[in-house]
């Protein structure tokens, strides 16, 4: 997911332009004085004895940092500094120190903070003068970090978005200490520098400046990914109304001139910089490609290729912008001039949901299939990350900062796993680092530029690189266990290393660790295995024979060992014991037919741990119901195995609201203290046989049981939607009544074909209804059921301006999991509007009507069975009285600034599970927080 899609930030991020007024001056505080005397007030600043705020340690030798308190006063001043030191839940030191400040001269007090091991620390200092006036109360952070690998590592995965605004010398020192091995862009290579006007190109003095900059990065052990920073100022295509645009806002006006600039940027530097990113986020009709189309981008890539490659065949051209963009644009099936890149870009901002792994594997497979060089340059994840403001807004600031730190290693590890399994090089650039300057997008800064001090994620990064650099990822240890990710490495010394973390679960947000998998990992043969937490704190020194380690969501535990990779693998799998508080994923399922004497309460039980379990499941039926038996053994359930346990219903009561709460209790054998309880509200979700007329009387739906979905905003505003479905020999019917205060519509497709229907008010109908999904590049992968599953069909209904009802095909066999763009070739199964009107159409019927008075939108859809041929065959072959199971889900999009956004049946009918291509848009699809994968069941009654 693009950061700009995620947070709507401006282009100054890419340009390296400092946003004015973003930050206050360097942190300081004034004493309590009258307003007219404010200019003469004393000032106080905090810093550390090492200006980076980072203290590398080696072996068991501790760091000895000092806090520097500088007081500047117009008159002589004395007082005290009260300080306290904390590291997560520990308080390793505190004290009070006196100070004396000479008049008009900065006076610095050095406060030793003790002997400290690797971790992230916070120092709170309160400075008070002798009169009792508080001059400063501030908390600043620093890191004690493990030693990182020195020198250049061109094959390293560890990159960083290092801001050009930041003071260069100290920023490079910070990056070097963190173990950063790649930076993105060369500050002295700007389009206007390379070609200040048509036909004129830079000369040796400017080239020498660029080469010196690159050499300086190399001196710090850091490689540079070259970047073409958009247009020359004189070569920007005007806007749609002829208005001038900024240099990043549109495609080049003269593409040939742009290609010459790119060639002249690369030619004198290609011996130092072999990899070049062609354009940042070239979203068609978006923020950097405002009037450009998909073919324009493909043309640009081809023209650059044809200009550069004859002379410099070893140069790698890196293109695209996201996995979905690469599939939709760069590799658009059947389109002209596809695949003129050596490697591709993705910007996977957001939580480390397993869909990041799914999408990266897809990215690699596309590159290998469709790049002109089979993706020889690998994958370049040139921006990704999380931020407290956007990803942890409901947590206290300090806790949110630790939340960001937790997400770093899982993000890298998921991408690294995809690269290792597909044998493709990958580089990953966390966004971003600026030591002392603000910029557009600095919510993602890993330093506090106001205080020039690191945040916890800096220590997490250094810990990761110190333990994983110079190591080759061998395999994932728990491919069947949804709770756990384990990554086995072979170090350069041949010894085994590993990283393990428990996954997070979505509970309406991904902020709360309590919602994720929590437990312990016990190693029963731990000799020679050293373990470290995600901030570098050592957990075990390798001398104990048995150790038990805590597992918390996204908190990576690293293992460094004296063992071979095979022996470490055995210690972490065969000889290990996992004890999770929620070892089973328990999901009461929807009823697939109207309630009657043959009904059962069905509960899906999945073992999410890496070990086989014996358990007992007891259910609590809805009020007024009786089932027998209530308790059923679930023995020998293997990792990743899912069973549906049926409880025959003896007595039931029909709910007018079609909502039934089923509770459950699970106990696991040999774990007497372990008890897992919960409940789920389930509904009857079935399609009876009915002849329906789209646009006809509502009474024809009277005896079709509706399902309901509810969305609630943070402010407590609640909206509900109801869905009814039916079928006959010609169509599958859906009727939806959606509460919506304000209708948000696109222009009709015939007016603007670039508008995405799923971004307006709309509903989506998603089906997993094809056994052979030949265009699903991940089918058959060992992790497919864990997190890679995609749907087969997706349809979107929306009301366009002018009262135009539209039904769009977003996905079906033959669409290659692409999204519609007007200048792409027509696919074997066309994307876009279907042949469907209210009264006729070969592919369906559709009527979307708006009731502004009652703030409701009604959707009536008839989908021809020709659009779901495999499901149609099953339904038609079913015996009278039987039920055909269908995997189906709906999504409601309430668009606009005041809308509720997306509401998913998959998150309301069950706990979501990560997948790959599921709901639209396909950028960000498949994550638990975007509906997850479609695996909810419905029944089609005959």
Predicted regions and their residues:
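Structural preference for beta-rich elements and adjacent junctions enriched in aromatics
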Residues: 652-942
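Mature N-terminal, pre-catalytic/accessory segment of carbohydrate-active enzymes
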Residues: 34-166, 565-622, 626-689
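Aromatic/acidic polysaccharide-binding cleft in carbohydrate-active enzymes
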Residues: 389-462, 477-479
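N-terminal secretory signal peptides and thylakoid transit peptides that target proteins
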Residues: 1-14
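Carbohydrate-binding surface patches
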Residues: 479-527
């Amino acid at each position: 997911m693009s950061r700009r899609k995620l947070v709507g930030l401006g282009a100054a991020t890419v340009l390296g332009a400092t946003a004015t007024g973003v930050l206050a001056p360097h942190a300081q505080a004034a004493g309590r004085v009258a307003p007219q005397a404010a200019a003469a007030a004393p000032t106080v600043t905090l810093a550390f004895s090492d200006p980076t705020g980072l203290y590398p340690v080696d072996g068991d030798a501790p760091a000895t940092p000092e806090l520097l308190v500088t007081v500047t006063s117009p008159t002589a001043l004395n007082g005290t500094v009260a300080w306290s030191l904390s590291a997560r839940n520990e308080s390793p030191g505190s004290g009070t120190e006196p100070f004396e400040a000479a008049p008009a001269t900065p006076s610095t007090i050095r406060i030793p903070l003790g002997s400290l091991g690797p971790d992230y620390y916070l120092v709170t200092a309160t400075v008070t003068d002798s009169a009792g006036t508080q001059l400063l109360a501030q908390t600043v952070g620093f890191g004690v970090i493990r030693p990182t690998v020195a020198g250049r590592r061109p094959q390293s995965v560890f990159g960083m978005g290092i801001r050009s605004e930041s003071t260069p010398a100290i920023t490079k020192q910070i990056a070097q200490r963190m173990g950063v091995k790649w930076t993105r862009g060369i500050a002295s290579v700007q389009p206007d520098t390379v070609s200040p006007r048509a036909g004129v190109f830079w000369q040796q003095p400017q080239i020498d400046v660029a080469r010196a900059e690159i050499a300086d990065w190399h001196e710090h052990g850091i490689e540079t990914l070259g970047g073409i920073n958009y247009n020359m100022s004189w070569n920007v295509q005007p806007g749609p109304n002829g208005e001038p645009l900024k240099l990043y806002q549109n495609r080049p006006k003269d593409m040939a001139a742009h290609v010459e600039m790119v060639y002249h940027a690369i030619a004198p530097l290609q011996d130092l910089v072999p990899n070049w990113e062609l354009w940042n986020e070239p979203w068609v009709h978006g923020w950097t490609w405002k009037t450009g189309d998909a073919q324009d981008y493909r043309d640009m890539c081809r023209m650059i290729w044809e200009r550069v490659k004859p002379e410099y065949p070893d140069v790698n051209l890196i293109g695209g912008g996201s996995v979905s963009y690469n599939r939709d644009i760069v590799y658009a099936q059947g389109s002209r001039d596809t695949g003129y890149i050596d490697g591709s870009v993705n910007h996977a901002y957001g939580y480390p949901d397993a869909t990041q792994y799914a999408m990266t594997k897809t990215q690699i497979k596309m590159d290998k299939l469709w790049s002109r060089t089979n993706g020889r340059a690998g994958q370049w994840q040139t921006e990704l990350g999380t931020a407290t403001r956007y990803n942890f807004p409901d947590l206290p600031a300090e806790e949110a900062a630790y939340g960001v730190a937790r997400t770093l290693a899982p993000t890298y590890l998921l991408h690294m796993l995809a690269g290792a399994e597909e044998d493709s090089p990958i580089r990953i650039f966390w966004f971003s680092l600026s030591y002392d300057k603000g910029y557009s997008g600095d919510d993602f800064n890993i330093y506090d530029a106001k205080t020039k001090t690191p945040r916890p994620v800096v220590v997490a990064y250094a810990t990761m690189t110190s333990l994983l650099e110079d190591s080759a990822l061998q395999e994932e240890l728990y491919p069947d266990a949804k709770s756990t990710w384990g990554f086995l490495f072979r170090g350069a010394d041949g010894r085994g290393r590993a990283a393990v973390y428990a996954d997070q679960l979505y509970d309406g947000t991904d902020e709360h660790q309590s919602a994720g998998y929590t437990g312990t990992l016990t190693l029963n043969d731990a000799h020679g295995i050293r373990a470290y937490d995600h901030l570098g704190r050592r957990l075990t020194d390798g001398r104990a024979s048995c150790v038990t380690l805590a597992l918390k969501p996204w908190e990576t535990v690293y293992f460094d060992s004296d063992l071979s990779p095979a022996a470490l693998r055995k210690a972490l799998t065969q000889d290990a014991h996992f004890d999770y508080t929620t070892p089973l994923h328990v999901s009461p399922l929807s009823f697939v037919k109207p309630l009657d004497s043959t009904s059962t309460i069905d509960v899906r039980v999945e073992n999410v741990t890496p070990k086989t379990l014996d358990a007992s499941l007891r259910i609590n039926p809805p009020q007024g119901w009786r089932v027998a038996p209530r308790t059923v053994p679930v023995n020998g359930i293997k990792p990743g195995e899912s069973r549906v346990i049926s409880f025959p219903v003896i007595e039931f009561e029909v709910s007018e609201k079609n909502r039934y709460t089923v509770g459950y209790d699970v106990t696991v054998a040999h774990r007497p203290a372990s008890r897992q309880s919960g409940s789920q509200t389930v509904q009857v979700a079935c399609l009876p046989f009915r002849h329906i007329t789209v646009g006809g009387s509502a009474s024809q739906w009277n005896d079709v049981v509706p399902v309901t979905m509810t969305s609630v905003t943070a402010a407590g505003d609640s909206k509900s939607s109801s869905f009814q479905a039916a079928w006959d020999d010609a169509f599958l019917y859906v009727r939806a009544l959606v509460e919506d205060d304000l209708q948000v519509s696109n222009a009709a497709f015939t007016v603007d074909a670039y508008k995405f229907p799923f971004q307006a008010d709309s509903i989506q109908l998603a089906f997993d209804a094809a056994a052979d999904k030949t265009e699903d590049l991940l089918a058959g992968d060992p992790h497919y059921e864990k997190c890679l599953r995609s749907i087969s069909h997706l349809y979107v209904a929306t009301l366009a301006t002018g009262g135009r009802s539209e039904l769009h095909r977003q996905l079906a066999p033959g669409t290659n999991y692409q999204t519609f763009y007007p200048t792409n070739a027509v696919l074997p199964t066309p994307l876009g509007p279907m042949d469907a009107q209210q009264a006729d159409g070969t592919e369906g019927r559709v009527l979307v009507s708006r009731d502004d008075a009652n703030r409701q939108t009604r959707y009536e859809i008839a989908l021809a069975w020709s659009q779901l041929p495999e499901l149609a065959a099953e339904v038609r072959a079913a015996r009278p009285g039987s039920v055909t199971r269908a995997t189906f889900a709906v999504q409601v999009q309430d668009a606009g600034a005041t809308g509720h956004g997306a509401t998913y049946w998959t998150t309301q009918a069950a706990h979501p599970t990560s997948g790959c291509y599921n709901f639209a848009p396909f950028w960000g699809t498949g994550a638990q927080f975007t509906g997850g994968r479609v695996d909810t069941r419905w029944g089609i009654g005959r």
